[in-house]
Amino acid sequence: MLTADDKKLISQIWTKVAEHGGEFGGEALERMFITYPQTKTYFPHFDLHVGSEQVRGHGKKVVNALSNAVKNLDNLSQALAELSNLHAYNLRVDPVNFKLLSQCFQVVLAVHLGKEYTPEVHAAYDKFLSAVASVLAEKYR
């Protein structure tokens, strides 16, 4: 459960993240593909090389979805319902992959935000991304 302090930290840091949507999202996906190569199977039609425009484009979509989640921290289930349906019923993505991408996204945040990515911010984002992953996996139950 996100506290009021968590929500404040998430929103404050997100303004910096959103400015670099394609870059941060693309880097997170690239890290996931390198670290967890089995995740590439969901993107057979993509050029998965580092710096690929397709990966950056999808990374921007990921960050846009997270932006929607940040705007709706009190109602993530409703905000992400359509995305949850898409991944569960159409794309049939194994929900463990949401957690893998969350881990990679946190590494990207730490790299780019440096000292601003304090232990408190890290904890808030860990809770936030875990909540997002849980909501995206709701339709699998």
Swiss-Prot record:
Coiled coil: none annotated. Heme b binds at H58, H87. It holds the Pfam family Globin. Gene3D superfamilies: Globins. GO terms for cellular component: blood microparticle; haptoglobin-hemoglobin complex; hemoglobin complex. One of its GO terms (biological process) is hydrogen peroxide catabolic process. PROSITE patterns: GLOBIN. Red blood cells. GO terms for molecular function: haptoglobin binding; heme binding; iron ion binding; organic acid binding; oxygen binding; oxygen carrier activity; peroxidase activity. It comes from the Eukaryota. Keywords: Heme, Iron, Metal-binding, Oxygen transport, Transport. Residues 1-141 form the Globin domain. Heterotetramer of two alpha-D chains and two beta chains. Involved in oxygen transport from the lung to the various peripheral tissues. Belongs to the globin family. This is Hemoglobin subunit alpha-D. It comes from Rhea americana (Greater rhea).
